[in-house]
Amino acid sequence: MNRDTPFTLVLGGGGMKGLAHIGVIQALVERGHRPTRIIGSSVGALVGAAWAGGMGIARLREIALGLRRKDVFAVAHADMAFKRMRSPALFKREPLEHLIARTVGDLTFQQLDPPVVVNTVDLNSGMQVCWGLPGLDDIRVADAVFASCALPGYFPPHEIGGRFYVDGAVVSNVPFDAARALGPELIVAVDVSASSVLTADAQDEGFAGVFARATEILMETLLEQRVRTWTTPAVYYIQPRVEHVTMFSFDHLREEVEEGYRATNAALERSDEWPEPGDVGIHPKRRVLVRVERERCIGCGNCLVHGPQGMFVLDSERKAVVTQPDQEWSPMDGGYIRHCPTYAIIARPADQKREMMKSG
């Protein structure tokens, strides 16, 4: 990507893992890449709005690395004790409100440079509402950001103009689909949600941890469905390696920021992988070889349901067979692999396979 290439930066949600976005912005700015606009969901909206509102990277890092659990997540003990199932949320709203006030203040959307769009959902209608778009920019940025961070069950819905809004991740956790209405320029999307096929021991984290993991699975599945047929504008997808961190963990704050910085610098170094003018779809694209380990296959047919049409068939022994082993994948392809209950589907980079054959 050239320095003069216009692009929209999309920052997805992911709880504390979203601190990686600070490193992402730092890497882009250091290399002279300034987005023409930012679209954010949840923590992505918070980081994007704070930076666009004039807060420097150094100050953002300082706040992020100094965060403690009580600064964001304070259990609403009184509501849980007295209101029980009618409690509005697990956590109090005040700590999050204070954090947003520290980073965003009383800014209006007109004061943000570059412009920022904040992804939310109307709780009662289910409609995606992107604050900051024309006609939706007459509220405080802090109100939009709180609503975007209000993951249902964890934080109470936020009232704006008599209606109640929650985290936009309910509909689109990495909302680059919202960029489609803003023009044909390149989209750089950053996904910090769980991307590991296996996430260990989620069942041991209590009901909040179990619900958080279930939410991650839901958001990832929704995202895959929304982008399966994506064409334009072209998207370059960056996935910092933070899948081992839970949404509510405060044990890896520095690592998350640094990983966002590393992943973005690494992506910018691979200039040959970035889409050219006129390209479509999601990038980077890489050749992979897909195979099925027959001894593991139980013939359940899940791969026929979740894989691309015609890619798998069952042979006479009800073993899955790959009809098109050589695939071109974007980061959003291959999700069907995790739907194999015996983990019999294997994908390897095509160049890795060729090197193994040469060395053998």
Residue ranges and their predicted role:
Residues 1-38:
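Helix-rich "cap/lid" substructures immediately adjacent to catalytic or cofactor-binding pockets
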Residues 2-7, 57-103, 121-141, 160-165, ...:
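Non-catalytic peripheral regions of patatin-like phospholipases
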Residues 302-318, 335-352:
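Iron-sulfur cluster-binding cysteine motifs and their immediate structural context
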Residues 320-334:
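Short linker/helix segments within small regulatory modules
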Residues 104-117:
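A short alpha-helix-loop-beta-strand transition element characteristic
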